A protein has these predicted regions:
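N-terminal Rossmann-like dinucleotide-binding module
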Residues: 1-53
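Mid-domain beta-loop-alpha active-site segment that forms a flexible
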Residues: 127-134, 160-193, 207-208, 314-315
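C-terminal helix-rich "cap/oligomerization" subdomain common to oxidoreductases
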Residues: 1-8, 73-75, 297-345
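Active-site loop of classical SDR/Rossmann-like NAD(P)-dependent oxidoreductases
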Residues: 22, 42, 282-296, 310
Length: 345
């Protein structure tokens, strides 16, 4: 494959469900310097719809796509059970890979993918799309600047209706990796203790209601409230610290700061009491579609030889933490010590 420095990159998409169609649209319309060259899905109707009005070729088999098309990048938006074989085929063909989260079904599969990318000299990154939300990026910048002072708690809320399309996993593995990843991304610390409760109310096989808690090494408490039972979507993240609280709305791309005007270095009782009386400030956010930002940064990293936008090891940790949450709920026990440390290594 020729150098990518000064030429149009050729992208492919594997998996043409709802999210796959979004990848098709963004690659085709929104990322400069990239052309959508090929798509693949076993559903012939889905392939026909995706290629209609576009120059991209359609395939019913990813292996044939890799054999017949010279690609630089591919989005793998297939079911989780297919991530490993499809990613291995792509990497062997010399194609840089973005795989939607979760990275894989197991640690072993994720490790195989990471090692295959290293051996092939190609990039593997993972679609943890919330990292590319402008509200979260602005929040991270402000936390790094110390605007909240000491951070006490991070509370993630991710609620919505039951998605009939999900069959292979429950709500924890499907959704919790988003927030587990963002917590580590924002506070720069690792969990040392976790506990979770789950219930199955509607889903026929897996849990659809989840509440979890994490204690991080730096003392921050993480709280997760996630379900498939709420008739409207809610996606928020609040971060509470000694100088107030930030609330980010993922959907609205909104970031609001509630100041604690009495906060000071000694953190007096008066300071605590005044939290409810703080002023509200809405931070200015330049709104962008997170998927467009994500794919543009993936393409730029490939073109420039940079590090992956999301380290696949971080994605593996998010997956394994989610699975440990399920284990905690099943056992009714706190998980800590070596049993949790093995997830991070």
């Amino acid at each position: 494959m020729t150098s990518s420095a000064n030429r149009t990159l050729r992208a492919g998409v594997i998996g043409l469900g709802m999210m796959g169609r979004n990848h098709v649209r963004v690659w085709d319309e929104a990322v400069p310097g990239v052309e959508l060259a090929a798509v693949a899905d076993p559903d012939a109707d889905a392939v026909e719809r995706a290629t209609q009005g576009r120059r991209a070729r359609g395939f019913d088999d990813p292996e044939r796509m890799f054999a017949e098309e010279e690609l630089d990048l591919v989005s793998i938006v297939a079911p989780t059970s297919l991530h490993l074989p499809v990613a291995l085929n792509a990497l062997r063909a010399g194609v840089n890979v973005l795989v939607e989260k979760p990275i894989a079904a197991t640690r072993e599969e994720a490790t195989q993918m990471i090692e295959a990318a290293r051996d092939a000299g190609r990039m593997l990154t993972v679609g943890h799309i919330e990292r590319f939300n402008p509200a979260i990026r602005e929040l991270r910048r402000r936390l790094a600047d110390g605007e909240l002072g000491r951070v006490f708690q991070v509370h993630a809320t991710r609620l919505g209706p039951f998605p009939a399309r999900i069959r292979d996993v429950g709500v924890v593995v499907d959704l919790a990796p988003h927030d587990l990843d963002i917590m580590r991304y924002l506070i720069g610390s690792e969990p040392v203790r976790i506990f979770a409760e789950t219930e199955r109310r509607i889903h026929t096989e897996h849990e659809d209601l989840f509440n979890g808690m994490l204690k991080f090494e730096n003392g921050v408490i993480g709280v997760l409230d996630i379900n498939w039972l709420t008739p409207t979507k809610k996606r928020t993240l609040s971060v509470t610290g000694e100088r107030g609280m930030y609330v980010a709305d993922y959907i609205a791309q909104d970031l609001v700061f509630y100041a604690n005007p009495e906060a000071n270095d000694t953190w007096t009782n008066d300071g605590v009491t005044s939290v409810a009386e703080g002023e509200m400030t809405r931070r200015r956010i330049d709104r962008q579609e997170p998927l467009t930002v994500e794919l543009a940064e993936f393409a730029a990293a490939v073109r420039n030889g940079d590090e992956p936008p999301v380290d696949p090891h971080d994605a593996m940790v998010a997956l394994l933490l989610a699975r440990k949450m399920v284990e905690s709920a099943e056992r009714g026990e706190v998980i800590a010590g070596d049993a949790l440390a093995e997830v991070i290594r």
